[in-house]
């Protein structure tokens, strides 16, 4: 096929594909994908210099390795982050925050039993580390242990009922047990909340109070800069993907999970598990196919 004809064919296919979608998607809300900042690069260089020094105590070295791992993770450099976390744990095996990150990576890799053990270790070392309930609950959710997932995510919700994303994750877990009851509980949580955080708009969509178009219009109006727009899009597209997945619309779900990932908000739970959702949907994800044995 001649290049010009090939381009015409592709353009026509894209146009027809667009026509099958809802009209508002013709003006899709997009953000510039987040990129590493100069400050982050400078901090990494400085950390490298300090770690090369022999003047650090074991505790200082373990803490700095952990902090560099967190920075690597925020940049999407998971292999480097895992390496730093593993080194930190070898020096200080009593760091709950390190077990928490390793548990997240194990969940993303689908190694659920090892993830449960990692999060159990977090709570054994620090019973007040509440985010371990979120992360273990998510691991249990993807691992098919629905009632245990509900227990963890309920504990996480109760720690801050005004956080909409706690209500959303609890809803996703309870939806697998009793969809009608789960929606009623979500409605109660919405009515009791202060409704101040952006994510309650997503809850309103789940409850059928607003349309998808209204949700996206509110998202665009609420964003103060490109960073907040990218973050809101990562969150919203993930939960929209879960919504369409529950309806059996795999094409829309796949597209939305890809949009959630495209914003490069690597340290958001929605980015992490959009990648896992794509893997479960059979998408080729080299990053997820790698071995996550710790």
UniProtKB/Swiss-Prot annotation:
It is a lipid-anchor. Disruption phenotype: Highly sensitive to osmotic conditions in low-salt medium and also thermosensitive under low-salt conditions. Shows pronounced filamentation at 42 degrees Celsius under low osmolarity, but not at 30 or 37 degrees. Growth in low-salt medium is severely restricted at 30 degrees and no growth is observed at 37 and 42 degrees Celsius. Shows increased eDNA production. Produces 100-fold more outer-membrane vesicles making the organism more resistant to toxins, and enhancing survival under stress. Higher sensitivity to ultra high pressure than wild-type counterparts. GO terms for biological process: cell division; peptidoglycan metabolic process. Residues 1-18 form the signal peptide. One of its GO terms (cellular component) is plasma membrane. PROSITE patterns: PROKAR_LIPOPROTEIN (PS51257), TPR (PS50005), TPR_REGION (PS50293). InterPro entries: Lipoprotein_NlpI (IPR023605), TPR-like_helical_dom_sf (IPR011990), TPR_rpt (IPR019734), Ycf3 (IPR050498). It comes from the Bacteria. A lipid is attached at residue 19 (N-palmitoyl cysteine). It is found in: Cell membrane. Pfam families: TPR_16. Its main location: membrane. SMART domains: TPR. GO terms for molecular function: protein homodimerization activity; protein-macromolecule adaptor activity. Keywords: Cell cycle, Cell division, Cell membrane, Lipoprotein, Membrane, Palmitate, Repeat, Signal, TPR repeat. Induction: By L-arabinose. By high-pressure at 400MPa for 5 minutes. TPR repeats lie at residues 62-95, 96-129, 234-267. Changing residue 103 to D: Loss of interaction with Prc and IbpB leading to thermosensitivity. A lipid is attached at residue 19 (S-diacylglycerol cysteine). May be involved in cell division. May play a role in bacterial septation or regulation of cell wall degradation during cell division. Negatively controls the production of extracellular DNA (eDNA). Processed by Prc protease in the C-terminus. Homodimer. Interacts with Prc and IbpB. This is Lipoprotein NlpI. It comes from Escherichia coli (strain K12).
């Amino acid at each position: 096929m001649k290049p010009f004809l090939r381009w015409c064919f592709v353009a026509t296919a894209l146009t027809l594909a667009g026509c099958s979608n809802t009209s508002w998607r013709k003006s899709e809300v997009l953000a510039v994908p987040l990129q590493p900042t100069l400050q982050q690069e400078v901090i990494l260089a400085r950390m490298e210099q300090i770690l090369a020094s022999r003047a650090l105590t074991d505790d200082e070295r373990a803490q700095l390795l952990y902090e560099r791992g967190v920075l690597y993770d925020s940049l999407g450099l998971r292999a480097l982050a895992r390496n730093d976390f593993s080194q930190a744990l070898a020096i200080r095996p009593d760091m709950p925050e390190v077990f928490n990150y390793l548990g997240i990576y194990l969940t993303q890799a689908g190694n659920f039993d090892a993830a449960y053990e990692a999060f159990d270790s977090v709570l054994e070392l620090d019973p007040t580390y509440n985010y371990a309930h979120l992360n273990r609950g998510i691991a249990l959710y993807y691992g098919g242990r629905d009632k245990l997932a509900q227990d963890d995510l309920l504990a996480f919700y109760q720690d801050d009922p005004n956080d909409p994303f706690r209500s959303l994750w609890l809803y996703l877990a309870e939806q697998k047990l009793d969809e009608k009851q789960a929606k009623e509980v979500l409605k109660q949580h919405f009515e009791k909340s202060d409704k101040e955080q952006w994510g309650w708009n997503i809850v309103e969509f789940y409850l059928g109070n607003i349309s998808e178009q209204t949700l996206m219009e509110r998202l665009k109006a609420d964003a103060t800069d490109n960073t907040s727009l990218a973050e809101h899009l990562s969150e919203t597209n993930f939960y929209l993907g879960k919504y369409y997945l529950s309806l059996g619309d795999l094409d829309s779900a796949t597209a939305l999970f890809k949009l959630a990932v495209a914003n490069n908000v690597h340290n958001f739970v929605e980015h992490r598990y959009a990648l896992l959702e794509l893997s479960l949907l059979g998408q080729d994800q080299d990053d997820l196919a790698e071995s996550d044995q710790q």
